[in-house]
Amino acid sequence: MNTSNHTPEPDRAVPAHIDLDDPNDSTRTIYRLAPRDEEQALLDVARDYLESFLGKEDCNQRRSPHLRIAAVSTGRGQAAEAIAREFPSTSVLLWYIDLFHQQRSLQHCQIDGSENASQLPSNLSIRCLADLPEEKLDLAIVPLPHRGEQELTRDYLQQCYDRLEVGGTLIASVDNPKDKWLHDQLKLFEKSVRVREHKEARVYLVEKTKPLKKLKDFRCELAFRDCDELVQLITRPGVFSHRQLDNGARQLLDAVDVYPEARLIDIGCGSGSVSLGLAMRDSAATIHAVDSNARAIWCVEQGAVKNNLKNITTELNANGDYTQPGTFDMALTNPPYFGDFQIAEKLVLAALRSLRSGGRLVLVTKQPSWYQENLPRWFQDCEVFPSGRYHIASGIKPSSQIPPTPLSTIG
């Protein structure tokens, strides 16, 4: 298990029909996908567990008649969906921290298939939340990729285990049949960890015998200086640049000025370093922070409270059509470097929709060539210039009537 941010690999397509890269695009062909190895192995074990558990005559004496289950997923939530359909007396919560993945799974569960109804099971809830609800569970199922982010994995495991009733069971799996790391993590909860071997994965079962004595706080509080002000920042696992200020965010902050009454939008705000820094510069300006990650939005909101800022608003959004389009003076973003610039293009176009005529896009990148070539397709007066180990790219939304928003470059 390494420490890179967890981006699940694509599931394997099983012909049945929508490429869900955009969960809101109804024109694309949809496919029902088979679960990844770790999720399929976990599903097999969970089925056996539930068949045995629900078949016991005294099960209702040990649990409520409605078995409460929570699940995470490395794909489209196939294990949670299958359990909900096959065991209708259960109540299943499928939990994501990212709205894009939540919407993608919601759509996937409603695809017609040879063995699946086209409607979402009534006992399955698919939600995007920063944290698992503080509700008691009888079973938690947690498939994990061996290349996932360690702290996020530990956070998931701890939350799921903490929510279990005493006597409840955690079933976790990893796509590494020789795994030791996950096994060691589970032994921190209980000494007895049962193992189920699979060809492509390893599955573990842990029965909760006592409450956890202490919960580890995986959040991190740090501070950075911007324009002689100390900005307090809160980061969490699963949010970009956990436990540190991203250097790209620093370059973005250094590249722009804020003027009174300005309306700025921070697209893909992460933990909010750019939003918080700019909001502290001028209380008369307003900053709208948007992200698809519920934890990112949580971090920004908590950061605003910690810095006593009243001029920040937030929006959880995965489709790029943000509130109050065409009204912002400046859009700022730090696009990711993966995806052959497909994600970068979506963010640039989201900025274009958000800006007023004459508004300015400012972004930071380590790969300036694509922006030099493509920004002029949508913006005028485009600039790309070096900033430390990065480049700042900028352009103005076309208009002949409204003067452009000024850009202050670093010296």
Residue ranges, per PLM feature:
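Non-catalytic substrate-recognition/targeting regions of SAM-dependent transferases
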Residues: 2-29, 174-243
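Conserved SAM/SAH cofactor-binding pocket of Class I
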Residues: 34-121, 247-333
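Class I S-adenosylmethionine-dependent transferase superfamily signal
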Residues: 83, 160, 278, 351, ...
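Short beta->alpha hinge that forms the Motif I/post-I loop of the SAM-binding pocket
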Residues: 97, 152, 291-296, 343, ...
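A short acidic, Gly/Pro-enriched loop at the edge of an enzyme's catalytic core
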Residues: 130-142, 320-331
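Conserved proline-anchored active-site loop of SAM-dependent methyltransferases
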Residues: 139-150, 267-274, 328-340, 351
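A short glycine-rich, Lys/Arg-flanked "PGG" loop and its adjoining helix->strand segment in the class I
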Residues: 154-166, 346-357
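Conserved beta-strand signature within the Rossmann-like core of class I S-adenosyl-L-methionine
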Residues: 167-175, 358-365
